[in-house]
Regions:
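Short, surface-exposed basic-aromatic patches at helix termini and helix-loop junctions that form
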Residues: 47, 70-77
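C-terminal domain-tail junction helix/linker
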Residues: 106-158
Length: 158
């Protein structure tokens, strides 16, 4: 999903990617809404993840996602689209965006933020325990799921 900021602060925006099961979040800073840079950053962020972490991606109907066929062909991930004006169809990402707005309010000039600053915000989101995860953090659940998929226990053997 794309998070926009005040127009007078330029075209810079952020894309939020949220893994549905663990709520693990990646936030990416974009210079504008053009599809090539936005989709390029998403591809770079997820291409090395195990397939379980990118089985499908749900986009909204924004123009920044029009190059989805090339994206899907490059990583072999099923893509879905929400119905127009239906944010409840991607409630997890909308909730995550609301959480991220604590650090990224609409009035913030994100052009001043570095990629490191953006990563710190993702880290805060990923290291905050969530009731829906049994008070585990998204990072813990994501790690457990990835290790389980690879056939390893997330906990050291005694």
């Amino acid at each position: 999903d794309l998070m926009l900021f005040e127009q007078r602060r330029g075209q810079a925006n952020v894309t939020s990617l949220v893994e549905r099961v663990s709520r693990f979040t990646v936030i990416l800073k974009n210079p504008n809404k053009r599809t090539k840079p936005v989709m390029g950053k998403i591809l770079k962020a997820i291409k090395d993840l195990p397939h379980i972490a990118r089985r499908s991606i749900t986009f909204d109907r924004g123009s920044e996602f029009v190059s989805w066929p090339q994206f899907q062909a490059k990583i072999g991930t099923q893509t879905w689209f929400c119905d127009p004006s239906s944010p409840w169809q991607k409630g997890t990402v909308e909730n995550t965006n609301r959480r991220a707005r604590r650090w990224l309010p609409r009035k913030r000039d994100i052009r001043q933020l570095t990629d490191h600053d953006i990563k710190e915000i993702s880290d805060r989101l990923n290291n905050t325990p969530r009731k829906c995860l049994g008070w585990k953090t998204p990072a813990e659940v994501f790690r457990e799921n990835m290790l389980a998929e690879m056939g390893r226990s997330p906990y050291p053997q005694k």
